[in-house]
Amino acid sequence: MEPILAKNPNRFVIFPIQYHDIWNMYKKAEASFWTVEEVDISKDINDWNKLTPDEKYFIKHVLAFFAASDGIVNENLAERFCIEVQITEARCFYGFQMAIENIHSEMYSLLIDTYVKDSNEKNYLFNAIETMPCVKKKADWAQKWIHDSASYGERLIAFAAVEGIFFSGSFASIFWLKKRGLMPGLTFSNELISRDEGLHCDFACLMFKHLLYPPSEETVRSIITDAVSIEQEFLTVALPVKLIGMNCEMMKTYIKFVADRLISELGFKKIYNVTNPFDFMENISLEGKTNFFEKRVGEYQKMGVMSQEDNHFSLDVDF
C-alpha cells in the first residue's frame, strides 16, 4: 500500500503540514486563482467575424473539446483521486483544482455562447462528446481511465497525459492566433488556462515522485505514446491545424516534444528526442513551473497570497 493512499485519521485537519512540497504546490494554485469575469471577450466578435469559415470551424471544435474535457477531469478527481489520496495537502490541491476546472469549463462555454449564435449549432458543440467523433475518441480514452482497475500511479500518468498532452496542441493552436493578433479574449483566457493546466500536470509529476511503488517505465511509456497518437490524429486528421494556417507535421512534432517534457519530468528517458518546432511556444506557460510567478503571466496573480519577492514560505510561525 502506498503511504499517500493509506488510511489517515488526521486527514480532516491541515496542520501540522507533513508534505511541504505538496502544500507549496497548493499555495501556488491558490495564488493564481481567477474568474471568467476578469476576461474581456467583448472585442473578440469583431475578429470572429473576420475569420474564414475554416478558422471558425477549427476554433469551434477546439472549444467544444475543451468545454467537455474539464468536466471529465473533475469527475476523476471527485470519484477517484479525492477519495483515494489520504494526505491532506494533496486533497487541498485536488479540491482547488476542481474549482479551477469549473472556471475553465465556464470560460469555454461562455466563449462558445458568445461566438456561436445559432442555438442548434450551440447544442451540437455543447454535446461534443456525443456529437463529434474526434472529440468522443479523446473523451472515451480519458473516461476509460476513471473506471479502470489500474493502480493510482497508472491513472495518475493517464490524467497527466490528458492535461499535458491532450490539451497541448489545442493550446498551441490558440497561441498561434495570438501571434497573429487575433481574438484577445480567447487568447488571454488560453494563457490563464494553459498555465493552470501546466501546474496540474506538474502536480501529477510531484505526486508520482511520492509513490514508493510507481508503475514501470514501460507502462508509463505505453500510456504516453497512446495519448500522443490520439492527439496527433485529432489535430492532423480529424481537425487539421492547416485549417488555421499551421503546419500539421510541425504540430505532430510539437506533441512529441510536449510528451518528452512530461516523461522527463516523471524521471524517465525521453521517447522522441525532438526539438520544439514552434518558436512562439518557447516562452509560454505550458509548463506549470514556467515562472508564472516571475513573469506574472497576463499580469495577474492573487494579491498577497504569495510574496512577490520569493515564492518560498515557511510555516515556522510562533503561535
Curated annotation (Swiss-Prot):
SUPFAM superfamilies per record: Ferritin-like
Record-level GO BP terms: deoxyribonucleotide biosynthetic process
InterPro entries: Ferritin-like_SF (IPR009078), RNR-like (IPR012348), RNR_small (IPR033909), RNR_small_AS (IPR030475), RNR_small_fam (IPR000358)
Ligand binding (Fe cation 2): 101, 163, 197, 200
Needed co-factor(s): Fe cation
Keyword Transcription regulation: no
Enzyme nomenclature, EC number: 1.17.4.1
Cofactor binding note: Binds 2 iron ions per subunit.
Active-site feature positions: 108
Chain residues that bind Fe cation 1: 70, 101, 104
CDD domains reported for this sequence: RNRR2 (cd01049)
Catalytic activity: a 2'-deoxyribonucleoside 5'-diphosphate + [thioredoxin]-disulfide + H2O = a ribonucleoside 5'-diphosphate + [thioredoxin]-dithiol
UniProt induction comment: Expressed early in the viral replicative cycle.
Ranges where the record places region Interaction with R1: 313-319
Pfam families listed in its UniProt record: Ribonuc_red_sm
Presence of keyword Ligase: no
Family assignment from sequence similarity: Belongs to the ribonucleoside diphosphate reductase small chain family.
Subunit architecture: Interacts with RNR1/OPG080 subunit. Can interact with host RNR1 supunit.
Described purpose of this protein according to its UniProt entry: Ribonucleoside-diphosphate reductase holoenzyme provides the precursors necessary for viral DNA synthesis. Allows virus growth in non-dividing cells. Catalyzes the biosynthesis of deoxyribonucleotides from the corresponding ribonucleotides.
Record-given protein name: Ribonucleoside-diphosphate reductase small chain
